[in-house]
Amino acid sequence: MMQYFSRNNAVAVEPISLVSLARLATPLINEVFKLSKRHGVRGLKKWEASSFPRKIATRIKSLDTVRTIWKSQPLSLQSFFHPPKLNFQGKPEFVTRLSAFEDNSVIIEGIVGQGKSIFLRSLAINEITSNDAQRLPIFIELKDLTSKTDLQGAIFRTLESYDIEIDEETIDFLFRSGKFSLLLDGFDEIEEKIVKATYLHIE
């Protein structure tokens, strides 16, 4: 468990273009697709299409557009967000990549409005915009869960939007491959009546 600590004074960068994002995502997409073929997994066959990286890029790019209390129009988070420090067992460290977390399961704590959601979005974007993307981020907003759409359903729906066909073999491959990161945002926004069930799903 880590606490959201503070932000540094780094200069914000210009939003990355969809074309550049697709280009940067391509090596990881190709790697995962080839790995799935070697394991005989058929659920990612649509990833072979030359247009697929752009589709993934569009999904990731959507995480970059956010609304703030300062502007009436949506902004690119890259235009204003500064990487934070997280408190790793009493030691504050700057974090910009998912690879900074040694554990596979991490909980980030912070007060309301401190920027945890924006931080998770930035981690997803930075993973792809780095020159050595290791994992494809799967971003889930827990506030959208209902008694009819549980966490598993939300995950499956997001995977389907990535042109992944849902079957037991494919799901097993995805979460054993080490090439996907599940980012769950908004624990404090889960409907009270489904909190327990959601926590059990996570465990």
What are these regions (language model features)?
Residues 4-10, 15-48, 52-71, 75-203:
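P-loop NTPase signaling cores
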